[in-house]
C-alpha cells in the first residue's frame, strides 16, 4: 500500500537516477478561472472568499507537500475581486492572460525538465503542460484525473477558464489565451480518468468528437491495467498528469469544490499515479482545485477577533 505521500515518490526516485535533470515546484494560486460560490453554500454570503479559497488552497498544498529541495517558483496572482467581467467568453480573461504570460516567462527562465504544479483551480495545468509539450517536441501524453472533463469552450454556458483547461491544453479556446501558449497536446494523446459528471450533453458530444477516451473510476478500482494499456499505445514516452482533487470520493474526504458522489478513493488515485509513473516518464504533475472550506471559515473567524482584525 502506498503511503499518503505516494504521489510524490516518483519525483524523488527519478531525481536520484537523473541528477542532471531539473525539477521545479510551481506554486500557482490562480483563482480567476472559477466562479463557484453556488457550490459552496457555507460561503454564499461572501463570493470573494469562495473564489479566493483557491489561493489559500495552493498555499496549503505547498505547506503539506513534502519538501524535496526542488527550486520553488511562485506565480504572482492578483487578489483583486472588483469588477469581474466576462471577456470573449472567459471570466477574468485579462487577469488570466497576464498571469499565464508571467508563469510561462518564469518557466522559460528556469528551464526545468519536470514540473510539479500546486494550484489553484484547474487552469494552472495549462501553462506548465504546454511548456513541457514544447520542450519535448510533442512526445508527451496527458492524463486528466478529474470528476469533470474540463472540455468547455468560450461561448458555453459557464465562462470559467478552469472548465476549459483540458481544451486549452489541446490548443482550443479563447484566441488570446491560446496564442501565448508554446505548444498544444494532440487529442490522440489525451486520456480522461475518473470522469463522472459531464454536466451537459454537449460536453460529452465534444469529448466524442475529439476522440478522447474516459476510463472510469470503477475500471481502475482494483488495478490500473486499462491505463497501462492506453499508455502503451499512446505514442509518447513521457506523460503529464493532472490531478483534480474533486475526483476523490466525498464520502471519504471533501477536499475540493465538487462533491459528486461515488468518486475514487485516495489510495486508488495514489496507486494509479504511481502505476503511470512506472509505465512512462512523468515530467509534469499538477494537484489542483484544493478548496479548504474549514480553513477559510477559521480565517474569517480570526479576521473578526480583537487585536487581529
Where are these regions (language model features)?
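Short, glycine/acidic-enriched loop or turn micro-motifs at the edges of active sites
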Residues: 147-151, 197, 245-247, 292
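Short, well-ordered beta-to-alpha junction loops that form the rim of enzyme active sites
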Residues: 29, 119-122, 147, 195, ...
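N-terminal amphipathic/basic-hydrophobic helices that include classical n-h-c signal peptides
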Residues: 1-17
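Short, glycine/polar-rich helix-capping loops at beta-to-alpha or helix-loop-helix junctions
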Residues: 198-205
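Active-site histidine-anchored catalytic micro-motif
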Residues: 114-179, 280-283
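Catalytic cores of soluble, metal-dependent hydrolases
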Residues: 19-116, 128-137, 209-309
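Short, structured patches in soluble enzyme cores that scaffold and shape functional sites
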Residues: 144-147, 170, 192-197, 216-218, ...
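Gly/Ser/Thr-rich loops at beta-strand to alpha-helix junctions
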Residues: 119-125, 197-198, 291-293
Amino acid at each position: 500500500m502506498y503511503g499518503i505521500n505516494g504521489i510524490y515518490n516518483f519525483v524523488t526516485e527519478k531525481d536520484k537516477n537523473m541528477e542532471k535533470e531539473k525539477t521545479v515546484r510551481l506554486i500557482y494560486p490562480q483563482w480567476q478561472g472559477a466562479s463557484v460560490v453556488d457550490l459552496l453554500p457555507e460561503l454564499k454570503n461572501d463570493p470573494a472568499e469562495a473564489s479566493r479559497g483557491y489561493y489559500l488552497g495552493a498555499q496549503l498544498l505547498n505547506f503539506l507537500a513534502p519538501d524535496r529541495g526542488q527550486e520553488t517558483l511562485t506565480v504572482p496572482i492578483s487578489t483583486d475581486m472588483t469588477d469581474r467581467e466576462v471577456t470573449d467568453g472567459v471570466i477574468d480573461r485579462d487577469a488570466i492572460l497576464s498571469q499565464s504570460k508571467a508563469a510561462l516567462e518564469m518557466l522559460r527562465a528556469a528551464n526545468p525538465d519536470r514540473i510539479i504544479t500546486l494550484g489553484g483551480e484547474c487552469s494552472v495545468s495549462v501553462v506548465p503542460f504546454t511548456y513541457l509539450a514544447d520542450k519535448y517536441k510533442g512526445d508527451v501524453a496527458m492524463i486528466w484525473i478529474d470528476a469533470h472533463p474540463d472540455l468547455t469552450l468560450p461561448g458555453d454556458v459557464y465562462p470559467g477558464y478552469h472548465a476549459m483547461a483540458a481544451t486549452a491544453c489541446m490548443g482550443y479556446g479563447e484566441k488570446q489565451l491560446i496564442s501565448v501558449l508554446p505548444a498544444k497536446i494532440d487529442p490522440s494523446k489525451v486520456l480522461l480518468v475518473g470522469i463522472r459528471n459531464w454536466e451537459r450533453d454537449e460536453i460529452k458530444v465534444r469529448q466524442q468528437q475529439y476522440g478522447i477516451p474516459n476510463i472510469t473510476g470503477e475500471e481502475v478500482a482494483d488495478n490500473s491495467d486499462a491505463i497501462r494499456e492506453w499508455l502503451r499505445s499512446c505514442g509518447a514516452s513521457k506523460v503529464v498528469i493532472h490531478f483534480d482533487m474533486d475526483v476523490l470520493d466525498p464520502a471519504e474526504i471533501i477536499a475540493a469544490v465538487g462533491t459528486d458522489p461515488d468518486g475514487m478513493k485516495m489510495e486508488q488515485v495514489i496507486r494509479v499515479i504511481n502505476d503511470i509513473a512506472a509505465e512512462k516518464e512523468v515530467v509534469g504533475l499538477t494537484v489542483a482545485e484544493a478548496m479548504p472550506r474549514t480553513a477559510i471559515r477559521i480565517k474569517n473567524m480570526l479576521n473578526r477577533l480583537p487585536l487581529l482584525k
